[in-house]
Curated annotation (Swiss-Prot):
The gene is NP. Encapsidates the negative strand viral RNA, protecting it from nucleases. The encapsidated genomic RNA is termed the ribonucleoprotein (RNP) and serves as template for transcription and replication. The RNP needs to be localized in the host nucleus to start an infectious cycle, but is too large to diffuse through the nuclear pore complex. NP comprises at least 2 nuclear localization signals that are responsible for the active RNP import into the nucleus through cellular importin alpha/beta pathway. The keyword RNA-binding applies. This is Nucleoprotein. Late in virus-infected cells, may be cleaved from a 56-kDa protein to a 53-kDa protein by a cellular caspase. This cleavage might be a marker for the onset of apoptosis in infected cells or have a specific function in virus host interaction.
Amino acid sequence: MASQGTKRSYEQMETGGERQNATEIRASVGRMVGGIGRFYVQMCTELKLNDHEGRLIQNSITIERMVLSAFDERRNKYLEEHPSAGKDPKKTGGPIYRRKDGKWMRELILHDKEEIMRIWRQANNGEDATAGLTHMMIWHSNLNDTTYQRTRALVRAGMDPRMCSLMQGSTLPRRSGAAGAAVKGVGTMVMELIRMIKRGINDRNFWRGENGRRTRIAYERMCNILKGKFQTAAQRAMMDQVREGRNPGNAEIEDLIFLARSALILRGSVAHKSCLPACVYGLAVASGYDFEKEGYSLVGIDPFKLLQNSQIFSLIRPKENPAHKSQLVWMACHSAAFEDLRVLNFIRGTKVIPRGQLATRGVQIASNENMETIDSSTLELRSRYWAIRTRSGGNTSQQRASAGQISVQPTFSVQRNLPFERATIMAAFTGNTERRTSDMRTEIIRMMENARSEDVSFQGRGVFELSDEKATNPIVPSFDMSNEGSYFFGDNAEEFDS
């Protein structure tokens, strides 16, 4: 994906800008994260959080959720039209944790949405700064991707739960714009389309009338987004067929599931960016760092440098392992839930273990959990090396992969063979003959069968020392391919309940 041509880089999508040169992009991304930081500092003042409390990731998440909720116009309108008991449509809030007498106390706060919107705009030069809001949504999405599996959702859509590596961004709200669409995995887009088609099958009026026309436009737009993620002509041609379907139904669902499976080997291009919790940007702003002046990139060294010198904390439950909690958050910060663990081991410089072996639950604490036994510890978010984030799926090769997750979706441009279990994947394409046959299908299956293990992805790309800011001396790591490389391997992570 080197020849970007007329495509906007995802930094430009992120900041809603037209084509800009590298310096302008760095400045506008800097302005975006600086705005998040200024807002966070202001909210800490507003809520009277001391330095330690402001560095608590749970407080950061509550503050992020409050501003996202304040700007969620559709939900706000819905709440006003359907008043429910105990929900004030004009207020938003959540748990804030304070340190009192050597213990963490939970306090449920409520704030006027108007007031929060005012603080947000003030921190962003009077603008709505939707790019910053989307950035926080992507951070929450990356955290969900790292914490939960989507087995139930996959099964509901008729997809194989082992296709979890395609599910990046599956909890992102629809309103997350172009930057949100860029980070959604192939499986996520397929699932959204299948849900839509199923509604059409069950509801005669779904595609009819003025509303139906709008639905159809949304359907075709989603098809085009998914088509843009595929890197082969045959996959794209199949997407055209799905998009042009007169009356989308089971044939289209079949095609979409076929395409999702094919993406396990013929990978789609999915953007990755390091989105950090608001408190990290807040700390930098509070220490006088000028993001806009210095410039910032979500896909280069900047997030790594920021995490090298940010000390943030997390609440820890009695049976949880603080090192494991750190790994969870570190992976989320770099959008690396579906990356090969061998690559992550190398970059982080400490052993990265599969989700099922992590002694940690999600970051957020439920309101019914007992605070008496809850402690806090520092999150270790530093890395040994850094690497450039990728938006390409890499080319595909035949490698051993696991029972729980049968493919990876690379996050970093680092030279390696990409693992996948060809036998398992190809087995999914035999049998079941009552579907449409087409040249495209035959062509896709042929390409999948011919994917070779000698093909190395990201030729010559490596990791860099943290002192090598300009990425001049790549270190190409060699990986032990006999080891297991997938994160959701034979896993028992909690389900994400939407």
